[in-house]
Amino acid sequence: MTVFEVKYEDLAGRIGTLRTRSGTLETPAFFPVINVLKKDEISIDEIRNIGFKNFITNSYILYKNNYIKDDIHKELRSEEMIIMTDSGAYQILEYGEIGITNLQIVNYQLKIKPDIGVILDLPTGNINDYDNAKKTVYETLKRAEEASEIIVKNQDNNIIWVYPIQGGRYLDLVKTSAEGLSKFEHIYNMAALGSPTVLLEKYMYDTVIDMIYTAKSNIKRGIPFHLFGGGLPHIIPFAVALGVDSFDSASYIIYARDNRYITRTRVYKLEDLEYFPCSCPICSKYTPKDLLEMNEKERTKALAIHNLYTILEEFKATKQAIKEGRLFEYLQEKAYSHPAVYSAFKRLMKYKDYLEKFDPRIRGDPKGLFLFDGNSLHRPEIIRHSRFLERYIQKKDKISIYCYDKAISDTAYDFKEKIREKIADRNESDVFIAVPFFGLIPLEISDSYPLSQFEIPNEIDEDVIDDMKTKIISFLRRNNYQKVELINCEKLGLHIDSISTSS
């Protein structure tokens, strides 16, 4: 059955709808982890009031404590909520053997009827031994096969079953694990990457980016993709850019227990804050000093509620960036919040061709590009234009290159209109505009998006200027112009001598 539909795309990220037996969920989405046995921490009602219509809870804990005996929605009085159940894999990661089998936990989930269920995979975690990591991959594959027969027999339950991908930092194992889904696509309607939690705790964001890319690039694009344990706002938009559709985490409460205050750019110790940089209901009502004077139970709940508001805000900001076609710019903005986040951004740029492949060429309401520095050279629009120049067919023996200057015209559109006025009916040369980031823009296509819909800084970084010169030289070398004319190019340091070796 088709459970996932895409509404908007940007880079390899998307806004979509996940159809479940209890309703439709817009993605990217966050599933707060709730331990329903710990009612003194965060309740389902509080999750709902914050703005979540979904959560994840641990079926192993429910089974072990005989807490839910029938329909989980009815017993938790959450008929309108979308409920995902995890299988106990996290407990295996923490404690080792947990005394329950894969088939037992699958049958239990069939009994309590969550919207989304997970088989009992064997998580790789932060295993540094390749052979042991390999065992977790093949054991998880074995368990996926083992559970498939029961799942097929009970398809009337309309549970979305998740295929867990393991392998940890060993990307060849992640690839093997992801490829295994092809055998079960009619059974498992959702895929999930496991084992990033320990790496995220150690700020190894770039490694997690590698893992996500490897998993995503080895399954079909249309399959919704979940990231277990990905609950920090710092990494969320980068994971979304690669195509992660949903996340879960208990970070909001774990950090709260340790007096840690999550913002969209970093995590603070409560003791280090004089002011709250937030206007959620908690931060509007209390000061850091107020929270420090609370008893531990009250303080933990207050911090957890704030942390959830922050996570929800990050998802809204990420979706808005996708809707506007500005996800790349948003990632650039986020990248400078922490060196580990910048490392994640730089690692993401390693996969720029993958991002370009799925980035839409045409948008319903296109926005102008904001181009900043050398990192902007990796944007899909810039990559596509470079490929276009490689295919350009020379028409004349002469080339006239006008260098773009913001001092002459505020916008690229006005600048190229002035060029048209200058050349009037002259038709003796191929006319181009030299623009940082783009390299050369043929005048005849300069009206097309985004070639006249962009903003660049007044001062251009040297590496961007060097890139422009390289693109121009490469273009001239590929063609056979008998005469090269440069107009108004002194400010960009472009002159005949600098390109003469290309002719």
From Swiss-Prot:
Provide the residue positions that the database annotates as binding substrate.
D121
Task: Give the active-site positions.
Answer: D86 (nucleophile)
Q: What is its EC number?
A: 2.4.2.48
Its GO CC terms are:
cytoplasm
Pfam families recorded for this chain? TGT
Q: InterPro entries under this entry? A: ArchSynthase1/Queuine_TRR, TGT-like_sf, TgtA, tRNA_ribo_trans-like
Q: Which cysteine pairs make disulfide bonds?
A: none
Q: Which GO terms describe its molecular function?
A: pentosyltransferase activity; zinc ion binding
Q: Which enzyme type, at the first EC level?
A: transferase
The residues that the entry says bind Zn(2+) are C278, C280, C283
So which domain of life are we looking at? Archaea
**Cofactor or coenzyme needed:** Zn(2+)
Pathway listed: tRNA modification; archaeosine-tRNA biosynthesis
Q: Tell me which family the UniProt entry assigns to this protein.
A: Belongs to the archaeosine tRNA-ribosyltransferase family.
Role according to the record: Exchanges the guanine residue with 7-cyano-7-deazaguanine (preQ0) at position 15 in the dihydrouridine loop (D-loop) of archaeal tRNAs.
Q: What is this protein called?
A: tRNA-guanine(15) transglycosylase
